[in-house]
C-alpha cells in the first residue's frame, strides 16, 4: 500500500461504484419528475393567448401597464411574480371541478371598459378591472384555485384572516409567491407562502385586464349598430354558462353563490346597467385628464356568477311600475320613438304578477331592466334584474302584425321571467340538472300565455312549438337523457347541454307531471320546493322529494310508485316509448322507439321500460287514468266491439311523452270515425293520429298505407294546423325532389286537390278580403306557408292566380305589403311565372334594402326563375358584383336547390369553381355536391359526380364526399321504394 497523499479525498472502488449508482438513480428520478411536471401546460399570466393582442393595442388610459418586479417584502404591496417555465405538476388544477377548499361569500367588482362614443371600436377594445373576493376557508391550503380565462393578472393579494365582526379589517396578509394559469381547465392558481386556516375568512384582491370582442357573444362583448342615422356601439355581457371567468376571476360554478357589489366606470354620455338599481355616481379622471363616470349599484342577493350582468349603452327606455317595482324596457332610440318596445312593456308587469301569485313568492329584486340588443346570439338571457334580449325577441314593429312575432315575444318574455324563480331564486346544483331551469321555464311559457289568452288552443300550440320537434329528434341509443348522471363536464360539453332535450323534453316532462297529478298538487309541490331552496341550490331529487311530500299529504291521487321512480324512468333514460294497444284483446305493451325500428337489441340495457301514465278517451269520453308500469299489461276496458261507434285513443291531449300505435283493428276504427264524423275526434287528436301514424310508418312500426288511410277524410278538415301536419309529413322535400323521376306527382295532385278546396277557400278568402283577421291566429300564421306553397306546387289555379295578384300589387305599389306568412311563396312564384323584368325588380329591391331578413327572402326568390340564362346571370352576379359580396347567403347553393337550377349550377361550376371557392369557401363546394347529388340512386351516378368534382377537392375531401354520397344513395333508394308504395296506394284511391 503506498503512502497517503498530503491532500485530497479518496474513496474505495466499491464506494465509487455505489456513488455512481446513486447518481444514476437520482438522474432517473429527475427524469421521471420532469415527465410528471410536464403533464400539463403551466402558463404565466404574461403568456396567455390573446393578451399579446391586448399589449399591442393602446394601453388603457387609466394607468400604465405595470412591469413585473422582484418579489417584495411583506411590508410592500405585492406585485405578482411568475414562474418562467410552462410546466406544472399533476394536481387539483387537472380536475374539471373546483376543489372545495374555499367558499366565496362576496365580490366587490369594478370594471372599466374603454368604450367612447367618439372612438368606435374596430373589433375589440381593452378593459381593466379589480375584484375583491371574500372567501371562507374550509380546508387548510396554500394553493388557491379560481376560474379565469383571457385575462392578464396584474396584481394579487390575499388579506386575512379577517377579524369577525369588523368588516374588512384584517390582522395580516398572506404572501403570494406565484400566480399562474392552467389554460385547459381555465384556472388561475395562486401559490401562497403559508396555508390558509380552516374556518377563517380571507379577501382575495386581484387586478386584471382583458379584451372586449365584437365577434363573440361571450363574456363582455360589443354591438356596433346604426341608430338615428349614426353608427354607435354598446357593451353587454353573456356569462352563462361559464363565461364569467372571461370577465373577472371568480368561482364560476352555479352552486357557489355569493353577493356582489358592482361598479362600472364608463363614458359620461353612456348609461350603465347591472343587476341591481343604481346606488350612486361620481366622477373620475384618467391619466390623460379625460372624465369618466363611476356608477355603483346596490348589493345583489346571493346568486351564481353566471347571472351577473352588465350593459353600457346610449339607449332610451320606456317604463312602468308593477306592484311598486319599476320595469324598464331599453332599446335603440329609433325603436323607442317608434313604439316598438310598448308591447313588451305592457305584458311584462302582468306576467310578473301572475307568477308571483301562482307561487306565492314575490319577485326578489326592487327593479327589472330588459334590454334589446341589435345582435345577441343567445336570443334572450334571464340575468337577475337585467334581462338581455335580441331585438327580434322583444321589439314589435307595425310591420310585424301579420307575423307570429307577437305570440313569440310573449313566449320568450314569459320564459325569461319564469327563470326569475326557476334558475335565479332556486338554481340547479350543477349543469347536469340544467333542465330544472330551462325545462320548467319553458313549460311555464305556455301556462302564462294560456292564462292571458284562454282562447288560444294550448294543446295544439304545445304540439307545434315543442312536441312535434322533440319527438322527431329523441331516439333511444342515439340521444341523451334530460338529466345526466355524469357531473364532470368540460366547458364545451356544458354549452352543448343547452339543446332541444333540455328545453323541449324538459318542458314535456313538466307538462306530463302536471297532467297525471293535477294542477293544484303540481303547483303546491313547486311552491314548497321554491320556498325551501330560495337563494340556494337544488338537485333533481330535491324536486322529487317535494312532489312526494305533496302527494303524501293527500289521498285523491294514487300513484303506482314513488314520484322519484316514476320520473327517473323518464329523465334518466334517453328516447321515449311507443305504446301499442291491441283493441281486440286489451293488451298494451311498451318498447323503446327506435329509428327504423331496428331489430338489433344488443345495445339495450335491462332498464328499458318507463312508468307510463295513460290518459285516454273512448268514444269521445275521457276515461280514468291508468298506468303501464311494466313491459306489457292487459286493460279489458280498452277492448272495442264491432260497433262502428266504438273507438279508443290513448294519450289524452298528447300530455304523455310517447307515440301511440294500435293493432289493425284499432287504426281501422279510428279511420272509420274520421270519415264518418271527424269533429267527434278533438283537433289535438286528429293532429296526433296523423303525426304518430306517419312517424310510425317511417320507422317501420306500421305500413305507410295505414298512415295514408287516415288522410281520406281531409275534404272535411277545416283546421289549418291539422293540414299543416299532414303536408309536413306527406309532401316532404325528398318527395318534391323526386317528382320528375317517379310518377307520383300527378297522382298526388289529383288526390290532394280534391281535398284542399275547403281549407283553401277559407284562407284564400281571408287573404283577399280581410287579411288582418289573421294577426291573432297563431296557428294560421305558422301554417299558412306550407298550405300555400303546396297548393301552388300542385298547380292549384287559384293559388297561382293569387300569387300573381299579390306580386303585381306589390310591384306597382310597394306599400301594398305581401302578407308575411306567404311572402316567400308569392315572391318565388312571382319570379317563376314572370320574366327578366320581374327578376330585375327584385334585384333592385335587394340592392336598396338594408333589412337582413328581406335580403334573405329576395335572394331565395330570385333563384326560383325557370330560365337558365337568368340563373346563370344570377350566379355571375353572386361571385362578382357588389350587391352580393357582403351577403352570407350562398347564392350558388340556393340556385342548385331548385329543380332547374340543379343542372345550371353544375354547369356553372365547371368554369367558375375557383371563383366560387374563393367567394364561399371549399366547404361550399362539398355542400353543392350534396345538393346537386341529392337524387343519386346508383354507384355510377356517384362516380360521375365525383369525377365531375375531382379537380376541385383534396384527397381527404373526396373520401368523405364519397362516403356521404353513398349514404344519400341509400336514403334515395329507400325513398324510391316508399314513393312507389305511395304511388300504388294513390292509384287505388284516386
UniProtKB/Swiss-Prot annotation:
Q: Which residues are glycosylated?
A: 132, 168, 261, 288, 319, 346, 607, 653
Molecular functions (GO terms): metalloaminopeptidase activity; peptide binding; zinc ion binding
List S-S links within the chain.
none
| Cofactor binding, per record | Binds 1 zinc ion per subunit.
Q: Which GO terms describe its biological process?
A: peptide catabolic process; proteolysis
Q: How does activity depend on pH?
A: Optimum pH is 7.0.
Reading the lineage from the top rank, the first entry is Eukaryota
Q: Where is this site: Transition state stabilizer?
A: 503
**Cofactor field:** Zn(2+)
User: Per the record, what ranges lie on the membrane's Lumenal side?
Assistant: 35-990
Keyword set includes Transmembrane helix: yes
- Post-translational modification as stated in the protein's UniProt record: N-glycosylated.
* Protein name in UniProt: Aminopeptidase Q
